[in-house]
Amino acid sequence: MCETSNCSSNNGSVESINSDCATVGCDQNKRDDARTLGRDICDEKSVAAASIKSSDFIKHETNFRKNHPSDHRKSWVLPLFHVPTNEPGVMWTGNFRRTPVMTFSQSCILGKCDAAEKLGRCYNMSYRLVRMESKLIRNILSAHGFQESANHLGKFNLLWTGGHLRPTQLRILSDFHKINHFPRSYEITRKDRLAKNVHRMQRLKGLHQFDILPPSFILPEEFQELCSAYAQDKVPYIVKPMASSRGRGIFLISHPEEIPCDEPVVVSRYISNPFLLDGFKFDVRIYAAVTSYDPLVLYIYEEGLVRFATVRYQPGFKHLRSQCMHLTNYSVNKKNFEFVHNDDANVEDYGNKWSLGALLRYLRSEGADVTGLMLRIEDVIVKSFLSVLSPILATCNLFPACQSKCFELYGFDIIVDDNFRPWLLE
């Protein structure tokens, strides 16, 4: 979400939304109407005096009752603020609902939406993409009237970056800026940092409270602990680079000695009893958006993706080298000739990619406890954020303005075992 703010037509600079008249649809007539409405509410016979006070750009009218001195306890403060308009694409939030926030609609991507585009252009909204390229992000912003800014002096409303900002950049952010990363959010996105944070919470709160990850070890420093665990269970383990994505560099092992020692990796116990659909392994991608870490405010999207392997699952050590059996990543399985594409957006339960809704409908038809499963998945996601809350919040406190300027979208990969228990993969 991007806060809409007043803009200068001369130089294109954007003023703070906290300025006296920077809210959407604010004009003098509406403020006069608000004052008139406030006075009409009061009984004119009981009003002896009225004084106008200004505090944080919000005007208040304090009414005193001259004829009833004993009723001073009934005196009240009537906030007189800019009257919110019902302008399409604008949602009013904050104290007294005086902060306008621009909302985005997915329908604007599918077809031209003149109202949304006009709104963005009216307020001279702009964006910058840094260290990344995304056709989807460009299309969404363009459909809502955002113009790409080539200016490097901070004259933009939204900065979408592929990395994190430096401390010097965080300190110069203005009120109208929105950034798509929180400082130090790699505490949850890097596999090694996530494992360390979850282990810390397991020590503090108990293993049963934060048993959301398969047992994981960070190598080379925890190699002996891995060997001890392997001696007890004798099960396959899965090796992952610390900061990779799309299934790159992932492989399974039958013994710790098979792990190369040339680079740091995260080794996790392989979930060898996955819940299968028609004999195929799958995982679920769930998206969550965080708008604040103090307090923690997160939104879990009700829809998601289900990604299937392209080779039927067979347990044991014999088939550990078959990536298309054990890994569900699209980037891995799309190379297999068995991969089935779905070219019909209206069909959600066909091919190697389903929607989460289609999966839940299928499970419900089979008599599964879908509600319980989704509650457990939600619990895993919430506890993941609680595990990283302390280090991220400590960094955010060094840059207080980040709390109102940053947001972040996260993707959670969840696998379900044959006991209908969800596990966080990354």
Language model features with spans:
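Generic detector of isolated residues embedded in canonical secondary-structure elements
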Residues: T4-S8, R35, D40, E44-K45, ...
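Solvent-exposed, charged interface segments at domain starts and junctions
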Residues: E61-M91, S149, H199-R203, H208-A229, ...
